[in-house]
Amino acid sequence: MSKVIGIDLGTTNSAVAVLEGKEPKIITNPEGNRTTPSVVAFKDGEIQIGEVAKRQAITNPNTIVSIKRHMGEADYKVKVGDKEYTPQEISAFILQYIKKFSEDYLGEKVTDAVITVPAYFNDAQRQATKDAGKIAGLNVQRIINEPTASALAFGLNKDQDEKVLVYDLGGGTFDVSVLQLGDGVFQVLSTNGDTHLGGDDFDNRIMDWLIKNFKDENGVDLSKDKMAMQRLKDAAEKAKKDLSGVSSTHISLPFISAGEAGPLHLEADLTRAKFDELTSDLVEKTKVPFDNALKDAGLTVNDIDKVILNGGSTRIPAVQKAVKEWAGKEPDHSINPDEAVALGAAIQGGVISGDVKDIVLLDVTPLSLGIETMGGVFTKLIDRNTTIPTSKSQIFSTAADNQPAVDIHVLQGERPMAADDKTLGRFELTDIPPAPRGVPQIQVTFDIDKNGIVNVSAKDMGTGKEQKITIKSSSGLSDEEIKRMQKDAEEHAEEDKKRKEEVDLRNEVDQLIFTTDKTLKDTKDKLSDSDRKPVEDALEALKKAQKDNNLDEMKEKKDALSKAAQDLAVKLYQQNGGAQGAAGQAGPQGGNNGGAQDGEFHKVDPNK
């Protein structure tokens, strides 16, 4: 089996790792960074992803951030020009980019992946994540919970039995999971969380504070200015990160707006104490899931051997202080909170490929599952924190005499009334023979696979007739839609490849024209007109093709000039005994070497 990569598809940043030997290793992106911003931008018909998309976000309104917050939302679409994209498609662009640079690193095709999700993601959100992987051309071997993945990274090669609490505060989601580790078994005992709480919310508090102060001082509301808001967002994120290391930071945004008297500048000093005051309720909001996870596991803080912090937002000092107080012990800092999830996903990939032995992962379903019964009551069949995969059946009956069909309304949640819980899907079991109310026996079976994806069936025990559905999530992508999106993604990949080849060709042509012109100028007195003419003619032909913007002609004339220049270099070498000619040879041949030489030339900083 080929390598199975592990992907942490994050709200703010994503990361990817692979098992090398027996150890997981982070794969760096083309910029050399170990995490990639989960940002997608559309500009001039081109799709930009990661660092480059984030850098131009201020000036480009068609930039999408934090799309993970909308995974599984049926009606959410991103409009770009006259086209609409689902959260799955935007996420697929990120996954496709990760897939590509992983393939470049490994030197082989990547088809299989383990993708992580917040432990508290519901079925719709999990299915949407799996669909995103499929659109990106990945066979998603497993969806695993982020805290579980970080526990895998922490617990690899550790033999002792431990109860571990994972506090996972990312860019947009929050989870707490309690696990039992021992003898290679990673068993999740409980999980709790909030899928709409994370580092973005901390950034927003700083932004709100800056907007209010600026309005009080200048009478201008920056929240109405899209470009100003993007600058504020970047500044708030930077200030938050700065305050993890220093007690005060200065925020400076010149020319943020304009008033009657001219340009307006934003200058502010934010102390860590003020930041803690602005965000204290957000930190406190994580206490309830913390307590509930312990309660559901049947444990107290005294039973916990280790506390692991996961997610970049756990670098916030107030968060670390709170967790230490609640847990009664110092959290473990042995693994990088930005990388642990991807590393754990890579380990699970190794388990799937057979490269890692003696590890068993026992995860749980985060929310209860059941159906709506008479009176709008939510009747649970599978309780939250049940180890998966699992299956559960229960017998129900009709609510009226001679009822010909039953509507199976599948739900997920913890509220007693169906209207307050999350609808996963509906289906109907028909052709029930006439019978008094309560006589027909309808067996409803819930089956949850290892990815947490739900299958539900209903069977009339009298006739043997059965109806079943795989919950495709309320985001509702059909196989046809996924195939169409896959095709779109592949076309974009082909377009990107063509665009890259075109840029490389133009760079090679520019370089070859420059070096050939220089060679002809430097050897003006050493060559006869008859020797120079083939090169001059080929050079003019290439310049014309470049001016006409004819790519086919440019390629043909580039090859012709390269050959003519090489012939000229040989003559120079013969005339001058080698040394001087060799210098002339280097230029024209440089243009014939493809992208590597050109890349090196273009990276030189003329100011250094």
Swiss-Prot record:
* Annotated segments matching region Disordered: 577-608
Name the residue ranges with Low complexity bias: 577-586
Query: Which GO terms fall under molecular function for this chain's record?
Result: ATP binding; ATP-dependent protein folding chaperone; unfolded protein binding
Q: Summarize the record's induction comment.
A: By stress conditions e.g. heat shock.
Composition-biased stretches, type Basic and acidic residues, lie in: 599-608
Pfam (any one): HSP70
Q: Which residues carry this modification: Phosphothreonine?
A: 173
Q: Which UniProt keywords are present, listed alphabetically? A: ATP-binding, Chaperone, Nucleotide-binding, Phosphoprotein, Stress response
Q: Which domain of life is it from?
A: Bacteria
Q: Gly residues compositional bias: what residue ranges?
A: 587-597
**PROSITE patterns recorded:** HSP70_1, HSP70_2, HSP70_3
Q: What does this protein do?
A: Acts as a chaperone.
Q: Which family does it belong to?
A: Belongs to the heat shock protein 70 family.
- Name recorded for this polypeptide: Chaperone protein DnaK
Gene name of this polypeptide: dnaK
